[in-house]
Swiss-Prot record:
GO terms for biological process: arginyl-tRNA aminoacylation. The gene is argS. It comes from the Bacteria. NCBIfam families: argS. This is Arginine--tRNA ligase. Its EC number is 6.1.1.19.
Length: 541
């Protein structure tokens, strides 16, 4: 509806028009502040301009039957949609069913490469990884729903010093807990019960001869063994959140193409040698300083691997590349973009979204750390505690780039203080009414909407506004808008439900038809959030 109204107004006024929702629902369904901009051009008051435009719009042939009223108010132009228009849009939504909200013009379709999570396979996924994981998965769902082509990839950092350290940590745990030797651990190593688990499992799975080689060979064997086990566990953790990737890219495999990439950087005059190191001239592209790619010992930095990986990605020529990183990687953006420019790519095609920290509470106290993983809260522990749907909803309920703190006990409450419960409860109420109704679903669907009051019309309008919520969520990377939409719609429905009996009125079929649209919109919104909406739920509020 929003796109349609905007298009009609722009055609009539021959100006770009901002169409927004009024702060006060009594002012109508939509509003535009265009008169404020035009007032400066025509040197008239915004109210005078608004009155002229309101008359022009209301009398134009393209708006006949579209609006009940077009009113100038304090410089704004407020629009109230006609019931006839809402009825036509309702029929279209009911015909689209689970596709309602997916309308997108084919020429706007994009090919998107979405990389997220990409946690090192050196330990189980913790709660900090979950936020970016859930966001990326839902962003992909929304993008595909809108007609875009999306590839979701997990970049596996399966080489380098952290993988060797994993193997060393397992080897030391093996010596201590299997061979019962006295062991001195280094200052930095991976700790936690999972390391001991891997060591004991290696004792059962690996050929005994492999663990009797020289220490460097043993560490190499255990590095690969532990890495593979961790990657399997990571996939299980993601599965518990309902997340599945289209592909997993191995850093070890990708880095085999490093020579060609470095040759290209050399040709672009992007490298120089200083202090026995090879540097990237990233400061030429807004980076704070140049960056080391090859260290004195001839080993490569993490950045070198990232550059080779991004070269592999950009060779595939997607419309847009989206990376979801932890907020602590903010400084990496400029250096990666610099490398893309040196390699001849358009770095503006890369968008990096940063996920801020998560702080979990339970009974207003910090959530207990996992003994298995050391100083982390594991995804699996929280999913087992509150369920994947509640966890997904709360992670998506705030902007990705803002800090998130919540008490998991809120997600266990069966009352209006628990937002996901309250949305489920709205849908449950609708399905209970439909079961109790003497009318068949077909009767309800075929009933024309002819006799709705202002509140009923507004509830219908809110339910039909799902497409705008979906579009805004994607375009602004603001998935919290989907959560806000679902919460607001559920709240409006509960107010409507509590205001009076629905089944015992002459227009019961009309009201049930509104309820069907509300249920459809809530269901479609939740599906895009990766949540299955419930049709049966108990209530204690």
């Amino acid at each position: 509806m929003h796109t349609l109204i905007k298009g009609i107004l722009e055609e009539i006024l021959e100006e770009e028009v901002i169409v927004e929702y009024p702060k006060d629902r009594e002012h109508g369904h939509y509003a535009t502040p265009i008169a404020f901009n035009l007032a400066k051009v025509f040197k008239k008051s915004p109210l005078a301009i608004a009155e002229e435009l309101a008359l022009k719009i209301s009398t134009h042939e393209k708006t006949q039957g579209l609006f009940d009223s077009v009113v100038a108010c304090k410089g704004y132009i407020n629009f109230t949609l006609s019931l006839d228009f809402l009825e036509r849009f309702t029929q279209k939504a009911l015909e689209l069913k689970e596709k309602f909200g997916s309308q997108v013009k084919s020429e706007r379709s994009q090919k998107i490469f979405l990389e997220f999570v990409s946690a090192n396979p050196t330990g189980p996924l913790h709660i900090g990884h979950a936020r970016g994981a859930v966001f990326g998965d839902s962003l992909a769902k929304i993008a595909r729903f809108l007609g875009h082509e999306v590839l979701c990839e997990y970049y596996v950092n399966d080489m380098g010093s952290q993988i060797r350290l994993l193997g060393l940590s397992v080897w030391l745990a093996y010596r201590e807990h299997v061979l019962k030797e006295s062991v001195t651990y280094p200052e930095v190593f991976y700790k936690g019960e999972y390391i001991i688990e891997i060591a004991k499992k290696a004792n059962n799975d690996l050929e005994p001869s492999l663990l009797k080689e020289n220490e460097e060979t043993i560490i190499e064997v255990l590095s690969g063994y532990a890495r593979d086990l961790m990657l399997l566990e990571i996939k299980d953790n993601l599965d518990a959140l309902g997340i599945h990737f289209d592909s997993y890219a191995s850093e070890k495999e990708v880095f085999k193409h490093k020579d060609a990439v470095f040759e290209q950087l050399e040709k672009a005059n992007a490298l120089y040698e200083k202090d026995s190191k090879i540097w990237l001239k990233s400061s030429l592209y807004q980076d704070e300083s140049d960056r080391v790619l090859i260290k004195e010992d001839k080993s490569y930095t993490y950045l070198a691997g990232d550059i080779v990986y991004h070269d592999e990605k950009f060779k595939q020529d997607y419309t847009k590349y989206i990376n979801i990183w932890g907020a602590d990687h903010h400084g990496y953006i400029a250096r990666v973009k610099a490398s893309l420019e040196f390699l001849g790519y358009d770095s503006n095609k890369l968008e990096v979204l940063l996920a801020q920290m998560v702080r979990l509470l339970k009974d207003n106290e910090p959530y207990k750390m996992s003994k298995r993983a050391g100083n982390f809260i594991l995804i699996k522990d929280v999913v087992d505690d509150v369920g994947k749907d509640a966890l997904r909803f709360i992670f998506l309920s705030k902007r990705l780039d803002t800090h998130l703190e919540f008490d998991v006990n809120t997600l266990k409450k069966q009352d209006s203080s628990n937002p996901i419960y309250y949305i489920h409860y709205a849908n449950s109420r609708i399905h209970t009414m439909l079961e109790k109704s003497p009318f068949s679903k077909e009767e309800v669907l075929q009933t024309p909407l002819t006799n709705l009051n202002a509140e009923e019309k507004y509830l219908l309008f809110s339910a039909l506004s799902l497409p705008k919520a979906i579009e805004s969520s994607f375009e602004e990377y603001g998935l919290q808008k989907m959560c806000e939409y679902a919460k607001t719609l559920a709240s409006e429905f509960h107010r409507f439900y509590n205001a009076g009996k629905i089944l015992d009125t002459p227009k019961a079929k009309e009201l049930l038809k509104i309820c069907l649209i509300v249920s459809l919109s809530l269901s479609n919104a939740f599906k895009l959030l990766g949540i299955e909406i419930k049709t049966k739920i108990s209530a204690r509020d």
